[in-house]
């Protein structure tokens, strides 16, 4: 303790100035800059004892003459030795080479020492609050949790799948991402979609396009609804229909591996039954179809024999009106919308048929007439209507009728003879004109 007191008192006493050649390199560079303008500010900035000794002591008086005591020599020696010790300067934050803002040279230090009062240094806030954009992205983690779009469900719901499937493979080790993407990475492991922390990640299969496979199943469904085996009491009919529909709808599933696991658990709430699927429900060509719509093609004499198999005697007009006003039974199988709606074939008449338009090459050259024909004979007969020529004369006695076309004369001649060559093969009714027979055949079809 006495030694420490002596040291403190010795420091307060006069000390000789050290020579300039023995100064440290750092203080040698700062000496032209510091000066003695504001001693209080220099004391706040430099906490080293050597700086205080170098700038704050008054000029030392000449030492007293006389012999020196050993304690005084020890104090003097210790003071001289303290000059060579490392001064305790404030710690300087370490900045990387590419982040140095100013050079560590003596020519730039003078900007930190100005005559203005206040903060002695222009404090760089980047030293105390570093910019995170210059840091490595791998060292910075976002505080916001990553939002994952994973639908989680308890494991107990899918217990039947874990029993029938093989145990899941062990999870793969975590794969490290590059540094520029590690800021977005979260602590997750690359594992198959199985049980993770008692949470099951549900794998939802895409919904199959039912309209693609419906045409192949429509015949079987229609056959199922029209078989007489379903006309049984409701107690057994319900379970049989449900099992059959289960098998029928299982054919629509594009993933056949999932059928044994899911088809047995669809109707768990229903009582078990021992109904076996009949052979007529197996995939085969259906034999029950709704009746096809009647053909609306006009009849002709050469097709009468072909239409005999499908025609019935025409009903009376009263029966026709009554059938249009009658209410159809909704339970009839014909009312089931089984077959996909197909557009009826487009029918053209003689004026709108595109095939006939291509073959119509004979134009009428009469002024203002736009008639076109496929045959030259038809055009010649048409030109007689413009010229008024009627070369075909009726040969019946006392008849002076003349016609421009031969078919018109033939039709007229039947009026004299009473011939009716066009006969209906269904009702045995005869007509003198073919168009009259075609109109009559439409009544049989309707």
Curated annotation (Swiss-Prot):
Tissue specificity: Highest expression in digestive track.
InterPro entries, per the entry: Znf_C2H2_sf, Znf_C2H2_type
Post-translational modifications: Ubiquitinated. Polyubiquitination involves WWP1 and leads to proteasomal degradation of this protein.
Covalent cross-link Glycyl lysine isopeptide (Lys-Gly) (interchain with G-Cter in SUMO2) as placed by the record, residue numbers: 31, 52, 83, 99
PROSITE patterns on file: ZINC_FINGER_C2H2_1 (PS00028), ZINC_FINGER_C2H2_2 (PS50157)
Region (Disordered): 1-22, 50-69, 284-310
Pfam families linked: zf-C2H2 (PF00096)
Region Interaction with WWP1: start-end pairs: 313-317
Subcellular location as annotated: Nucleus
Keywords carried by this UniProt record: Activator, DNA-binding, Isopeptide bond, Metal-binding, Nucleus, Repeat, Transcription, Transcription regulation, Ubl conjugation, Zinc, Zinc-finger
Any one of the GO CC terms: transcription regulator complex
A GO molecular function held by the record: RNA polymerase II cis-regulatory region sequence-specific DNA binding
Family: Belongs to the krueppel C2H2-type zinc-finger protein family.
UniProt comment concerning the protein's domains: The 9aaTAD motif is a transactivation domain present in a large number of yeast and animal transcription factors.
Oligomer and partners: Interacts with WWP1. Interacts with ANP32B; this interaction induces promoter region-specific histone incorporation and inhibition of histone acetylation by ANP32B.
Protein name in UniProt: Krueppel-like factor 5
């Amino acid at each position: 303790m006495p030694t420490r007191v002596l040291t403190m008192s010795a420091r307060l006493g006069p000390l000789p100035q050290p020579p300039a050649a023995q100064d440290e390199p750092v203080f040698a560079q700062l000496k032209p800059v510091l000066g003695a303008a504001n001693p209080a500010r220099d004391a706040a900035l430099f906490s080293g004892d050597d700086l205080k000794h170098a700038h704050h002591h008054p000029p030392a008086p000449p030492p007293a003459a006389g012999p020196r005591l050993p304690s005084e020599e020890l104090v003097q020696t210790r003071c001289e030795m303290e000059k060579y010790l490392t001064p305790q300067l404030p710690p300087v934050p370490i900045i990387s080479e590419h982040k140095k803002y100013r050079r560590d040279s003596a020519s730039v230090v003078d900007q930190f020492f100005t005559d203005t009062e206040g903060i002695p240094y222009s404090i760089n806030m980047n030293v105390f609050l570093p910019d995170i954009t210059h840091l490595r992205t791998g060292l910075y983690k976002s505080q916001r949790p990553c939002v994952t779009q994973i639908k989680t469900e308890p494991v107990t719901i899918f217990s039947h799948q874990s029993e029938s499937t093989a145990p899941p493979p062990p999870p793969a080790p975590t794969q490290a991402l590059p540094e520029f993407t590690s800021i977005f990475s979260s602590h997750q492991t690359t594992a198959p979609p199985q049980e993770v922390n008692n949470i099951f990640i549900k794998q939802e299969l895409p919904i199959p396009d039912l309209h693609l496979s419906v045409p192949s199943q429509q015949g079987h469904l229609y056959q199922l609804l029209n078989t007489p085996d379903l006309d049984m009491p409701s107690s057994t009919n319900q379970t049989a229909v449900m099992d059959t529909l289960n098998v029928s709808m299982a054919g629509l599933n594009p993933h056949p591996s999932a059928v044994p696991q899911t088809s047995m658990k669809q109707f768990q709430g229903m009582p078990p039954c021992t109904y076996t699927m009949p052979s007529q429900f197996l995939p085969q060509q259906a034999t029950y179809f709704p009746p096809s719509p009647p053909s609306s093609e006009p009849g002709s004499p050469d097709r009468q024999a072909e239409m005999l198999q499908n025609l019935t005697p025409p009903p009376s007009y009263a029966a026709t009106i009554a059938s249009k006003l009658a209410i159809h039974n909704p339970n009839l199988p014909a009312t089931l919308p089984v077959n996909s709606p197909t557009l009826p074939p487009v029918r053209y008449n003689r004026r709108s048929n595109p095939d006939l338009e291509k073959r119509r090459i004979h134009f009428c050259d009469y002024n203002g007439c736009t008639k076109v024909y496929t045959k030259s004979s038809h055009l010649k007969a048409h030109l007689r209507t413009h010229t008024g020529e009627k070369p075909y004369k009726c040969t019946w006695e006392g008849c002076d009728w003349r016609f421009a076309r031969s078919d018109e004369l033939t039709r007229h001649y039947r009026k004299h003879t009473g011939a009716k060559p066009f006969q209906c093969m269904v009702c045995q009714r005869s007509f003198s004109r073919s168009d009259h027979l075609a109109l009559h055949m439409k009544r049989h079809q309707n």
